[in-house]
């Protein structure tokens, strides 16, 4: 699929990995819709760093836990920027949820943002993709789906569901739309998790380091440029999955 001047929606593009993905898509010639929920300042910083700035790219706010907000987000994006050809489901939340103290609210929050939202985003954009005969969806999953972290079970469960959703969407949307997932290991940890100990994840990997945003961006670019890969989960975890 030719990427030049096509529209890409990147969720959670105001910070960290989403910001880096948006920057790379713009470098590939795409027009980027930068979604954010709370990170308005980061979203503005993202668009200011893209070629063409706000004259070429779009910033939109939405709470992806609400399906009505998803429909409004996609509708506004396509009205202002044009048909969405690429969807990057990057927005997610991640925090400790010890088994015996996890609340219903925490469970519902993580499953809604990390699994429900990617489903309804894909549902909303994919019909147009199929009718136009092309489209690409990339879901950010996680290396923990195979070996869940016991203190993050709702998060790991949501990402395991997203793996299944990725493969199911690839089947449902073929042959016009390619759907793949990227499973990062420990990559670009959030500042508010500075006190968390990620040394075990590093030790139980082959490359013995935390990944960078660039490591994931390269995987995104590969999946966008390839027209013969679908239904695949690409591990980018420093070899943790085979340690």
Predicted regions and their residues:
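Alpha-helical segment proximal to the catalytic Tyr-Lys
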Residues: 127, 170-175
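Conserved glycine-rich Rossmann-like NAD(P)H-binding loop of the short-chain dehydrogenase/reductase
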Residues: 28-45
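Conserved Rossmann-fold SDR core element
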Residues: 25, 163, 173-187, 229-236
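Conserved glycine-rich cofactor-binding loop
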Residues: 7, 14-15
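Active-site helix of classical SDR
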Residues: 122, 158, 166
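Substrate-binding pocket helix/loop in short-chain dehydrogenase/reductase
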Residues: 98-99, 106-111, 137, 201
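C-terminal substrate-recognition "lid" of short-chain dehydrogenase/reductases
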Residues: 212-236, 241
